[in-house]
Amino acid sequence: MSLMTKLGLRTLVASCLIAVGGAANAQLNVLVTGVGSTQFPIATANFANEANSPQQVSTIVRQDLQRSGKFTNIDAGATPVSETDSVDLGSWKAKGANAFVSGSVNRLPNGQYEVRFKLYDTVKGESLGGLVLVSPESGLRMSAHKVADYIYAKLMGGRGVFATRLSYVIKTGGRYQLQISDSDGQDAHIALSSPEPIISPAWSPDGTKVAYVSFEKKKPIVYIHDLPTGRRIVVSDQKGNNSAPAWSPDGRTLAVALSRTGNTQIFAVNADGSGLRRLTQGSSIDTEPCFSPDGQSIYFTSDRGGQPQIYKMSAQGENAGAAQRVTFTGSYNTSPRVSPDGKQLAYISRVGGGFKLYIQDLQGNTATGLTDTTHDESPSFAANGQYILYATQVNGRGVLAAVSTDGRTRQVLSVQGGSVREPSWGPFMQ
């Protein structure tokens, strides 16, 4: 299979999606299929007064912690416990919980909702603090995710990604929909609906914009979509293909793959569509650019060696130095994505007759397969670098999946009766 044949699936896959029935903004269903090697036992009580709120905050917190694969939920019973209530930490420790969470949800006079909670270490017998979160009714789920992020940070020592968002493409009723959801696939809404395919969504570093390729004018054009306002601008509408947008870490520049000169090459363009400049100079096909976290390098896919492999060049282009090959395990590797700390590379490798998600240590160059599926594509790191979101197939139907970088924890996110593709995991929210 040629490079353009395989990568052409990124352009054509949207037209092959199965129509999704039901609500236009269908929610993703999450199935956790694995857990971490060790799990932290925690009890999260029902929050006081949440029975009268539109969202059961404590339930969302428990679900977040469970799907991370790093926690096991100890039954806290049905009795609500407020953050102001006295807590017998010794009794919770005796029940097997090393941490305990209590809280409350209250509707304020202005119609907003206030979530308060407190986290306890039952082993040391001390409080680990808490937060007060105020939001409109529509923000209650996000408040719950922020509670889970706080717990994750205090007990795991790193940032959680429950309060981040996902983007992906669904086809329903003959229209293509770019949808934005919470990290658990809930609270989904449509950012763009079109009768033509939408592919390759990419989040801006500040999480307020998504770049993507739309075929609404019967050809691929790169747009930037401002999510709060819905305003769009054209970034690249060159002759031929305009594809694979990737943001620089400072949000000022995008790398794109264009065929305006013949074979597809990598270009850079300012985020307002000005200042187009060519970065790769050869006669090969160069595509799928991805910036390193420090913005100094660009990883990309090229067939310059005969078969598709992943290369690295200066963000200033090949005029600043020849690109260096990065992948050597396997004869066919595409779709590079660099971890937020710059230490790992996720990519898709052809294994036998299928395509599997791999991760490579960029210091030791050791490559490891993470999945047992054979139709993997479009990897995207979580903002904390602990998980990778990707598209694949289960029982012949397109789904999204997430796997921890150690391969132990796996989640499948699907839409009832249909297929979903083109995932991108958003950054930490500002």
Curated annotation (Swiss-Prot):
Could you tell me where this protein is found in the cell?
Periplasm
User: What InterPro entries does the database record attribute to this sequence?
Assistant: 6-blade_b-propeller_TolB-like (IPR011042), PD40 (IPR011659), Tol-Pal_TolB (IPR014167), TolB_N (IPR007195)
Query: Mind listing the UniProt keywords for this protein, alphabetically?
Result: Cell cycle, Cell division, Periplasm, Signal
Question: What is the superkingdom listed in this entry's lineage?
Answer: Bacteria
- Signal peptide location in the record? 1-26
Role of this protein: Part of the Tol-Pal system, which plays a role in outer membrane invagination during cell division and is important for maintaining outer membrane integrity.
State the family it belongs to.
Belongs to the TolB family.
Q: Which HAMAP family match?
A: TolB
Q: How does it assemble?
A: The Tol-Pal system is composed of five core proteins: the inner membrane proteins TolA, TolQ and TolR, the periplasmic protein TolB and the outer membrane protein Pal. They form a network linking the inner and outer membranes and the peptidoglycan layer.
Listed name of the protein: Tol-Pal system protein TolB
